[in-house]
């Protein structure tokens, strides 16, 4: 995961100090890209320990089209707690846009199912896109989509994915985003009869919050370790049938966790 440390170092050394919505302040750059070959290990950060359980359950929750945190709470995942209302609702966030994008004629479009079908029937399509950024509904969302749009690409029997992330909290959010979209790519590849290729991560505003500088410096002192391997139950052939128990991580030996505050 040298690529991630390079991003962090680049922002610290070359970024612009800015104010932000949360009042914390950031140092940021605009426009950056990382690439991860999914055939060379699962890109789960090793320079600090990550809570894989939260990453997997959040992705399964997105794929259900769910926008209430009850499922997450039932599975001891708290990463969305700060944004939910008193009923646990978040508004029409990621899952709703992925699975139920509202069309002007009253239909609801299942973008994930549509892309799956197109990967199988028309793998050379340049329209294998899912968007979570719906301008008509952004103001109704508890948090507008940070990871806003992703596109799939098939070549030589491998499925790759590129994510455009408009806003990236490098210390807390980005490690989760890398692992989540890498896993989604692997799951999509399996159910489409393909191998996993690359995950390409493209950023708009990539930033470190000012209250994360000390933690970032500590992480940069640590040497990356060998990437783990993600084993996925090969019997699952339907994307929407995956369960938490279908994933097994082997060989994860990270440095200790580094605590940092979330800016809401």
Swiss-Prot record:
Pathway(s) served: Pyrimidine metabolism; dTTP biosynthesis
Question: Which GO terms of the molecular function aspect are on file?
Answer: thymidylate synthase activity
Naming one, the record's GO cellular component terms include: cytosol
> InterPro entries given for it?
Thymidate_synth/dCMP_Mease, Thymidate_synth/dCMP_Mease_dom, Thymidate_synth/dCMP_Mease_sf, Thymidylate_synthase, Thymidylate_synthase_AS
Its GO biological process terms?
Answer: dTMP biosynthetic process; dTTP biosynthetic process; methylation
Which residues make up the binding site for (6R)-5,10-methylene-5,6,7,8-tetrahydrofolate?
A: 51, 169, 263
Compartments it resides in = Cytoplasm
Reactions catalysed, semicolon-separated, are: dUMP + (6R)-5,10-methylene-5,6,7,8-tetrahydrofolate = 7,8-dihydrofolate + dTMP
Q: Where does dUMP bind?
A: 21, 126-127, 166-169, 177, 207-209
Q: Where are the catalytic residues?
A: 146 (nucleophile)
Stated EC number for the protein is: 2.1.1.45
At the top level, the lineage of the source is: Bacteria
Recite the UniProt keywords alphabetically.
Cytoplasm, Methyltransferase, Nucleotide biosynthesis, Transferase
Q: Which family does it belong to?
A: Belongs to the thymidylate synthase family. Bacterial-type ThyA subfamily.
HAMAP family given for it? Thymidy_synth_bact
Q: How does it assemble?
A: Homodimer.
- State the function annotated in the UniProt record: Catalyzes the reductive methylation of 2'-deoxyuridine-5'-monophosphate (dUMP) to 2'-deoxythymidine-5'-monophosphate (dTMP) while utilizing 5,10-methylenetetrahydrofolate (mTHF) as the methyl donor and reductant in the reaction, yielding dihydrofolate (DHF) as a by-product. This enzymatic reaction provides an intracellular de novo source of dTMP, an essential precursor for DNA biosynthesis.
PANTHER family cross-referenced by the UniProt entry? THYMIDYLATE SYNTHASE, THYMIDYLATE SYNTHASE 1
Protein name as annotated: Thymidylate synthase
Underlying gene: thyA
């Amino acid at each position: 995961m040298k690529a991630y440390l390079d991003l962090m170092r680049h922002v610290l050394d070359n970024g612009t100090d800015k104010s932000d919505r949360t009042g914390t302040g950031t140092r940021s750059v605009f426009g950056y890209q990382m690439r991860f070959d999914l055939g060379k290990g699962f890109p789960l950060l090793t320079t600090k320990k990550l809570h894989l359980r939260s990453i997997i359950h959040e992705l399964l929750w997105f794929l259900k089209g769910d926008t209430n945190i009850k499922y997450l709470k039932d599975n001891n995942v708290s990463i969305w707690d700060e944004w939910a209302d008193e009923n646990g609702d978040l508004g029409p966030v990621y899952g709703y846009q992925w699975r139920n994008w509202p069309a002007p004629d009253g239909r609801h479009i299942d973008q994930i199912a549509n892309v799956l079908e197109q990967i199988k029937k028309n793998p050379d399509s340049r329209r294998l896109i899912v968007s979570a950024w719906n301008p008509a509904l952004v103001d109704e969302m508890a948090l507008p989509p940070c990871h806003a749009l992703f596109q799939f690409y098939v070549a030589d029997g491998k499925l790759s994915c590129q994510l455009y992330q408009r806003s990236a909290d490098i210390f807390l959010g980005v490690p989760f985003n890398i692992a989540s979209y890498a896993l989604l790519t692997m799951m999509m590849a399996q159910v489409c009869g393909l191998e996993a290729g690359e995950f390409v991560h493209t950023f708009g505003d990539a930033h470190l919050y000012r209250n994360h500088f000390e933690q970032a410096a500590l992480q940069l002192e640590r040497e990356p370790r060998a990437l783990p391997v993600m084993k996925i139950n090969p019997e699952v052939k339907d994307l929407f049938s995956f369960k938490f128990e279908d994933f097994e991580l082997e060989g994860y030996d990270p440095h200790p966790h580094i605590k940092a505050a979330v800016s809401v």
